[in-house]
């Protein structure tokens, strides 16, 4: 169809004259239009044939682009670059994510320590070079699956391993920091509280027992912590350095605000050494001049006193208070006994003991002779006056005499003697009928007119 240029009437392409106005159409224009339409139709056919090829080419381009995008983010080199960038930029959160495993979660603070440790102990430039070379060798190798990057001192700091593939084409590289166990060994049962793996952690360590506090990646650590003992609560730090360990563990140094007490006693020469005690904050402990007591919190006053026995009597010092402001890591204090009071009492008791010993020497000299006479004559009456009637010892000796089983004794020596009211205990060294020296403990009763009688006896 075509339009009349004069009146606009529609007409067939082969019509020569317009039926509306009689205008005569140009035959050359019709021929041109026909040729143009044929060209368009030919071009359309060609275009339809090219579309599938264009789509295929476009898809191929997309695949190539996608491959390079995947390669940029998933190839071993790309994985290496992610870790390197995180360390270079001190991105502790990214490093923590990359190093965390199912069994050991690394928090951002631990990652921060790790980053600094790499820069100090390897050097960033050297670390990047070692990491790239290691990844390249593993990627090319058909047999090796893992390798370590080390510090200048030869300690392992990063494990690089092949762990399957990504998107079929790329080796999946795994970066894992080796761990060690920091260990504590407190002098008394201690509870430690600190943050690890992004969570609050509590560790209870028994006295003088090696106890691990967790698993940590390489670094030089100073972890804020609280510890609690029978002596109180302490604020401070747990410190440990991987450079100081060549094993699977690393010793922890405790840095807390604590005071240790050294005690010196004066005026205690007459006291029994084994009886000496120190009482700190109402807790009594055995005294030793070489012992350090504590630790105790530096933010609280400390009360301290000492006690000891002489001749069965307990003597104490005055209680002293050490102000918190005077407490230091090593704090020394001197406690004074009233030496004159102790010496007067000891002198008095020694006189009494000497008098008692003299009585006992006389008593046991007579008793040994009477005992032997009773044995020789088979007559209990010789010894009966030395033993309290009605006591189990009285009946036992009487039975032995009648059976002829009473043992002869000689040369009695008084080793020790104590009097409590009307009761006396004495340790006596004798020679028995076999000629052997034996120590026996006797209990006596002092009756009217200071008369002594045996109640019981036993071997020491």
From Swiss-Prot:
Q: Where are the transmembrane segments?
A: 50-70
Highest taxon above the source species:
Bacteria
Q: What is its main location?
A: membrane
Topological type in the membrane: Single-pass membrane protein
Keywords, A to Z, come to: Antibiotic resistance, Cell membrane, Membrane, Metal-binding, Transmembrane, Transmembrane helix, Zinc, Zinc-finger
Q: Which residues lie on this side of the membrane: Extracellular?
A: 71-460
InterPro entries in alphabetical order:
Mem_prot_TcaA, TcaA_2nd, TcaA_4th
Listed GO molecular functions? zinc ion binding
Zinc fingers (C4-type), as residue ranges, are 4-21
Q: Name one GO biological process term.
A: response to antibiotic
- Ranges in the topological domain labelled Cytoplasmic: 1-49
Q: Which PANTHER family does the annotation name?
A: MEMBRANE-ASSOCIATED PROTEIN TCAA
What this protein is reported to do is described as: Plays a major role in decreasing resistance to glycopeptide antibiotics.
To which protein family does this belong?
Answer: Belongs to the TcaA family.
The protein's name in its UniProt record: Membrane-associated protein TcaA
């Amino acid at each position: 169809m075509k339009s009349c240029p004069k009146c606009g009437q529609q007409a067939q392409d082969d019509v020569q004259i317009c039926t509306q106005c009689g205008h005569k159409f140009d035959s050359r224009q019709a021929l041109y239009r026909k040729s143009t339409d044929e060209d368009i139709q030919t071009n359309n056919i060609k275009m339809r044939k090219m579309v599938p090829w264009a789509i295929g080419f476009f898809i191929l381009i997309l695949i190539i682009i996608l491959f390079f995008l995947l390669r940029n983010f998933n190839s071993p080199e790309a994985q290496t670059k992610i870790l390197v960038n995180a360390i270079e930029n001190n991105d502790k959160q990214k490093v923590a994510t990359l190093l965390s495993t199912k069994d050991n979660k690394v928090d951002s603070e631990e990652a921060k320590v790790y980053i600094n440790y790499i820069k100090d102990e390897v050097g960033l430039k050297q670390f990047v070079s070692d990491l790239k070379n290691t990844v390249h060798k593993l990627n090319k190798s058909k047999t090796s699956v893992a390798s370590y990057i080390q510090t200048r001192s030869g300690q392992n700091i990063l494990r690089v391993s092949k762990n399957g593939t990504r998107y079929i084409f790329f080796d999946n590289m795994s970066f894992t920091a080796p761990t060690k166990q920091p260990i504590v060994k407190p002098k008394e049962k201690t509870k430690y509280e600190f943050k690890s793996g992004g969570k609050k952690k509590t560790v209870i360590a028994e006295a003088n027992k090696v106890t691990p506090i967790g698993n940590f990646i390489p670094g030089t650590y100073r972890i804020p912590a609280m510890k609690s003992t029978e002596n109180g609560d302490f604020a401070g730090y747990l410190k440990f350095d991987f450079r100081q360990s060549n094993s699977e563990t690393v010793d922890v140094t405790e840095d807390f605000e604590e005071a240790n007490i050294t005690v010196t006693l004066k005026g205690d020469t007459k006291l029994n050494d084994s009886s000496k005690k120190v009482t700190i904050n109402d807790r009594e402990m055995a005294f030793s001049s070489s012992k350090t007591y504590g630790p105790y919190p530096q933010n609280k006053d400390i009360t301290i006193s000492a006690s000891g026995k002489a001749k069965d009597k307990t003597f104490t010092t005055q209680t002293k208070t050490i102000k918190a402001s005077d407490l230091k890591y090593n704090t020394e204090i001197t406690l004074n006994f009233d030496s004159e009071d102790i010496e007067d009492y000891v002198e008095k008791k020694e006189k009494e003991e000497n008098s008692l010993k003299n009585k006992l020497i006389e008593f046991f000299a007579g008793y040994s002779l009477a005992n032997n006479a009773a044995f020789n004559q088979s007559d209990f009456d010789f010894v009966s006056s030395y033993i309290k009637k009605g006591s189990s010892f009285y009946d036992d000796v009487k039975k032995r005499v009648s059976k002829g089983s009473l043992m002869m004794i000689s040369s009695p020596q008084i080793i020790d003697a104590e009097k409590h009211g009307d009761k006396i205990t004495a340790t006596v060294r004798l020679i028995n009928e076999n000629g052997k020296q034996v120590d026996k403990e006797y209990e006596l009763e002092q009756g009217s007119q200071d008369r002594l009688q045996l109640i019981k006896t036993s071997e020491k």
